Amino acid sequence: MASGSNVEEYELDVEALVVILRDRNIGRNPLHGEIIGLRLTEGWWGQLERFQMVRLILQDEDNEPLQRPRHEIIPRAVNPHTMFVLSGPLAELQLAFQDLDLPEGPLRFGPLANGHYVEGDPYSRSYRPVTMAETAQMTRDELEDTLNTQSEIEIQMINLLELYEVETRALRRQLAERSSIGQGGISPGASHSRPPVSSFSGLPSLPAIPGIHTRAPSPPRATSTPGNIPRSLGDDNMPSSSFAGPSQPRVSFHPGNPFAEAEGHRPRSQSRERRRDIPSAPVISAPVPSAPPMIQYIPVPPPPPVGAVIPIQHIRSVTGEPPRNPREIPIWLGRNAPAIDGVFPTTTPDLRCRIINALLGGNLGLSLTPGDCITWDSAVATLFIRTYGQYPLHQLGNVLKGIADQEGVATAYTLGMMLSGQNYQLVSGIIRGYLPGQAVVTAMQQRLDQEIDDQTRAETFIQHLNAVYEILGLNARGQSIRASVTPQPRPSRGRGRGQSAPEPSQGPVNSGRGRQCPAPGQNDRGSNIQNQGQENSSQGGYNLRSRTYQPQRYGGGRGRRWNENTNNSETRPTEQSPQTPRPIQAGSGVRGNQSQTYKPAAGRGGRGNQNRNQRSSGAGDSRAVNTVTQSATSSTDESSSTTTAAPSGGQGN
């Protein structure tokens, strides 16, 4: 037998097939790819009718004739009304179709494989249930499917028989009424009870009621009143018939019958009482009239319930479209399984199978059966094996490592539990090596040791992992949150003696030590920039209190004790030469200039004005001055300046 995927192929004898066709007056040759239905009239199962479907393979893919033609089994039900069918015993058809045998399950019933019995159809009339020989050759699942189909067919046959029985009883009742009318004893319009069962002979009898005995029909007796007593006079005795009655009725109108209704009692006739007083007359019991046949309607079993409507569009809006790469589908499904259960709970494997097949409708070869979808774990494991192939269990670590690098440890743990059949000891030992850092390993081990057993640890592993990630400042994949934040440039702050950072310039820098004075209205802008710089500086590193006032020895000066109105009203030079000392304005004292001029330290030759310009211009938020650089600069200035620089240096003290 040559097998291609799941199709069973066997050898074909074309010459024997041509002989079979000629024996049945079919004047043509078999065709390549032709599908033929085989009607097996008898075989090892007995003289019962069974069906099989085959397809002829006479050419290869290049349309060249095969040296050894083949036929393949098609697992579909044969429909003799729409396809070509060959009939014959199994031994004769096996001459052409080698290794021919019965199909699996209910397909052997042919047109009845779907369980629908068609009244009047010749193939439905030839239905016969499976025999013991067939049952012995079936597997458990195959036998269940066959018996389910067989029970559906036989239930329909029972319903038809019951309908036939009802029609038969109605015909009996009509026949009894016509026979009684033909004897002249009862008028069609008169009220009367049912005729005795003895009036129609030859039909099947009804069951007798216990306690009511039958009697032989009595001959007509002579009466004092000429003619027959009509039924309307109250005589319970029916005119006897020449036909023999087979049985007793179920219900009668006799007053002594316990089955009679209370309001249906008929009064005794006086003529009957007079006859009972005559001693010479033999006592003959009256026949019990028949009751109408009781029609019992057995309700037809309800149709199978329609499956639940799956909101596939709503589910797809939550999960998104499946990946185009089939190898990414198992991971995608395992990650979205909780979301699917949240949108539409899957309570049965059949429902879970329908949802998965609907989501993966465009991926051929990934369709699942309810047996593959008992749980989400089994469904994901089946898809993983179909896309990646069968893998040994000792390679599960390599599989989970790739998943952990791509999707994170949580996803790797979930899929590992699915692929290993909920083997917590194996998966936890593998996942432990993929945790990001010893701190996570220690914290996880401490939390898991507090659980009762492995089942509880397996259920709470993801919760503990997310909690540890949150404590350590990691994201869902175990990566640092700080690394994901884009660093923002910020102005530097003074960090003490001998340390300074480059400050971003916010305007053209003029030559020399002096800087351009800010225009009126820029003081507020400079203070805002300074506050923003302090806020930005507190984002990184340690969160320390900003230094609002620096001591004089660090270049902070004496604080904001000058009069801002006076400073705004005074005119200051916009640019100073590093070689020329700042002249003293007329009409202002030395102490007044010192208080109005921001001088950080003594002997620094006009640096106070420069520091004030730096703070008001908003070029930087730092009040620190590099003392080492300033000392070197001051010494150079003192050696090259004129004698007017000495008083200004002394005034700084």
Swiss-Prot record:
Biased composition (Polar residues): 564-579
Region called Involved in viral assembly and export, residue ranges: 37-60
Region annotation (Disordered) ranges: 179-286, 482-653
Biased composition (Basic and acidic residues): 262-278
GO MF, one annotated term: DNA binding
Site positions for Cleavage: 316-317, 344-345, 357-358, 626-627
Positions of the UniProt region annotated as GR-box 2: 540-561
Biased composition (Low complexity): 526-543, 609-618, 629-653
Keyword Signal: no
Post-translational modification: Specific enzymatic cleavages in vivo by viral protease yield mature proteins. The protease is not cleaved off from Pol. Since cleavage efficiency is not optimal for all sites, intermediary molecules are expressed.
Pfam families linked to this entry: Gag_FV_central (PF20672), Gag_spuma_C (PF20673), Gag_spuma_N (PF03276)
Motif Nuclear localization signal, chain ranges: 540-561
GO biological process: microtubule-dependent intracellular transport of viral material towards nucleus; symbiont entry into host cell; viral budding via host ESCRT complex; viral release from host cell
Motif (PTAP/PSAP motif): 289-292
Gene Ontology CC annotations of this record: host cell; host cell cytoplasm; host cell nucleus; host chromosome; host cytoskeleton; viral nucleocapsid
UniProt domain comment: Gag protein contains 3 glycine-arginine motifs (GR-boxes) necessary for RNA packaging, the first of which has nucleic acid binding properties in vitro. Late-budding 'domains' (L domains) are short sequence motifs essential for viral particle budding. They recruit proteins of the host ESCRT machinery (Endosomal Sorting Complex Required for Transport) or ESCRT-associated proteins. Nucleocapsid protein p14 contains one L domain: a PTAP/PSAP motif, which interacts with the UEV domain of TSG101.
Note: Foamy viruses are distinct from other retroviruses in many respects. Their protease is active as an uncleaved Pro-Pol protein. Mature particles do not include the usual processed retroviral structural protein (MA, CA and NC), but instead contain two large Gag proteins. Their functional nucleic acid appears to be either RNA or dsDNA (up to 20% of extracellular particles), because they probably proceed either to an early (before integration) or late reverse transcription (after assembly). Foamy viruses have the ability to retrotranspose intracellularly with high efficiency.
Free-text function comment from the UniProt entry: Involved in capsid formation and genome binding. Shortly after infection, interaction between incoming particle-associated Gag proteins and host dynein allows centrosomal targeting of the viral genome (associated to Gag), prior to nucleus translocation and integration into host genome.
Protein name: Gag polyprotein
